[in-house]
Amino acid sequence: NDGATILNLLDIVHPAAKTLVDIAKAQDDEVGDGTTSVCLLAGELLKESKYFIEEGMHPQIITKGYKEALKLALQFLHENAHSVADKNETEKREMLIKCAQTSLNSKLLAHYKEFFSELVVQAVETLETNLLDKDLIGIKMVTGGSVTDSFLVSGVAFKKTFSYAGFEQQPKKFNNPKICLLNIELELKAEKENAEIRIENPDDYKSIVDAEWELIYEKLRKIVESGANIVLSKLPIGDLATQYFADRNIFCAGRVDAEDMKRVQKSTGAIVQTTVNGLTEDVLGTCNQFEEVQIGAERYNLFKDCPHSKSATIILRGGAEQFIAEAERSLNDAIMIVRRCMKANKIVPGGGA
């Protein structure tokens, strides 16, 4: 039921229709909701202007008239806007919840609007008021359970990545851990296709293999010496590294999604490293608590109460995947609306108010 999603999936050729798609996309990016409304409004304006075009009126005159109408409409909206800045925290929060409920009214989650509007407002309130960075709110979909089993994590959460043998021995909970973020592979690599090594005797081959092992062990030693308790990498962390870290009570995860990595980086203050040379405590991040928990049929890594930048993750539960995907789009719209209200500190009652 998301206007922007429907329009994006349509195979449109007509130039005027493409303009409507662009309008919906701009509305979705800037405001996050009202994509259907803006398309209906634009369509009606085009419909009304058709009569004047047929009468021979120049398009520039029509455009000028619409610009004047825009000024009057904006003036009217500003005059009728209600400020929420002068209200106390309780009243302001109630207003934000009502805004979230209005957004959810026309969506799939309308039946659960009281529950999810509270969740959305909590998520936006978690962010730092001066920034309200929407990228710091994540929504993770977990199939199974009831919709009302959804909950908010005050921090970053993402699904456990593929793990090699040895991860079972790794610790699953830390308080105030030091977090190392990498963009390097930590595994023994197979030879490239058509690679060729010419050796005179077996000792030469042994020295090549030993050198390769020494290289990866050197990388692992430097990471351990930095004092890191948690190691995350965008690239694979192999079974050798996994077991090496497990022996030293270090948690590791490879192939972490770029978006999740970015949120961990912003929240914990860690700096992504492309080499282990010069790896010091200064580039490590931290959070109040890290733990790996079971949610439904999946394992999730939770970074709670990150001090560097406040963040939040909504764990969205539900039966069918299609239902959860639609619910995610609905929540995104509600989050954008609440965020917009907090930034502008003004709201305008709708026609049904």
Curated annotation (Swiss-Prot):
InterPro entries: Chaperone_TCP-1, Chaperonin_TCP-1_CS, Cpn60/GroEL/TCP-1, GroEL-like_apical_dom_sf, GROEL-like_equatorial_sf, TCP-1-like_intermed_sf. One of its GO terms (cellular component) is cytoplasm. Keywords: ATP-binding, Chaperone, Cytoplasm, Nucleotide-binding. Belongs to the TCP-1 chaperonin family. Molecular chaperone; assists the folding of proteins upon ATP hydrolysis. Known to play a role, in vitro, in the folding of actin and tubulin. Pfam families: Cpn60_TCP1. It comes from Tetrahymena thermophila. Heterooligomeric complex of about 850 to 900 kDa that forms two stacked rings, 12 to 16 nm in diameter. It is found in: Cytoplasm. Its main location: cytoplasm. This is T-complex protein 1 subunit eta. GO terms for molecular function: ATP binding; ATP hydrolysis activity; ATP-dependent protein folding chaperone; unfolded protein binding. Gene3D superfamilies: GroEL (3.50.7.10), GroEL-like equatorial domain (1.10.560.10), TCP-1-like chaperonin intermediate domain (3.30.260.10). It comes from the Eukaryota.
